[in-house]
A protein has these predicted regions:
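Short terminal alpha-helical segments
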Residues: 3-30
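Short, surface-exposed loop/turn segments at secondary-structure junctions
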Residues: 1-5, 28-38, 74
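Low-complexity intrinsically disordered segments
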Residues: 40-42, 50-107
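Alpha-helical segments in soluble extracytoplasmic regions
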Residues: 14-17, 31, 35-47
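Short amphipathic alpha-helical segments enriched in hydrophobics
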Residues: 22, 26, 48, 52-55
Length: 107
């Protein structure tokens, strides 16, 4: 992601689309359990709020802790890269679990 704002927008769009699809399926497709669909929508909302809360993190070291500015920038870059990668992996795992639940509604 280019910045935190666009990452948060993408998280909101993805979760909103999933919730919309679940509501659409609940209302249009006969035989879908409304309680399970509502539970999935609640899970989507929880995933969204958790992911948005995790987007804010800070590098806890200062320039003085390193030998040079280059070492500081390198360490800071790798820290944020790993943090965003972890956030995206957790978010994608949550999305996969929700999609499996949504597909289970159709059985």
């Amino acid at each position: 992601m280019a910045n935190k704002r666009s990452l948060k927008k993408q998280i909101r769009y993805i979760c909103g689309d999933l919730a919309g699809e679940c509501i659409f399926a609940r209302e249009i497709i006969p035989g879908i359990d409304h309680d399970k669909a509502n539970g999935i929508i609640i899970d989507i909302a929880a995933l969204q709020s958790e992911a948005l809360a995790k987007t804010t993190f800070a590098f806890d070291k200062s320039v003085r802790d390193f030998e040079s500015r280059h070492a500081y920038r390198t360490a800071r870059h790798s820290y944020f890269k790993n943090a965003y990668k972890t956030l995206l992996n957790e978010f994608n795992a949550g999305i996969d679990a929700i999609l499996k639940e949504m597909n289970g509604l159709l059985d």
